[in-house]
Amino acid sequence: LMNDDYFQAWINRLSARYCDVVSYNLYPLGFERFKPNGLPDVPVLITESTVGHGTRGTFGSITNPGVEPGARNRALARQLESAFSHPQIVGIHHFKFTDQVLTGRWDGENYGFGLVDITDTPDRDFLETNRAASEQLYSFRSGAGVFLNLP
């Protein structure tokens, strides 16, 4: 589902009837209000989501939390904590591995939301936040632990 029909009740009911897991590509910084119209209590996988940056040379601004130091990591921690807290969300997939080139891909999209930039230089703080979140996922989801404490 990649269009305005995302939250049409009939599509969600039909998806839940024939799919074990329903997936969405969404880019919010929080999932507290995520409740697809007509979707019963079935597992949901967020198959494409990200937090961008405004500090590494690209112009696209999808889910860009700002340019101040640490903004991207704090936004990622908030996004992941929100997803991990949602009772229906069973996973969230980061899109994508590399930043997009400045001149854009085939459709002109040129976002800076990769784990590495276009020269394969890792965003080490962002990778560390992802790693820490992955390590804490199960204890947090089970209620036995707290989530990331970022400055």
Label every model-predicted segment.
Residues M2-T63, A77, E81:
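Glycoside hydrolase catalytic-domain groove-lining segments
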Residues R13, Y18, S82, H86, ...:
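Alpha-helical structural signal in soluble globular domains
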Residues N64-A71:
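A short acidic, glycine-rich active-site loop
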Residues P69, A77-Y111:
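Long, C-terminal catalytic modules of enzymes
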Residues F95-P151:
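Aromatic-rich peripheral "rim/lid" segments of glycoside hydrolase catalytic domains that contact
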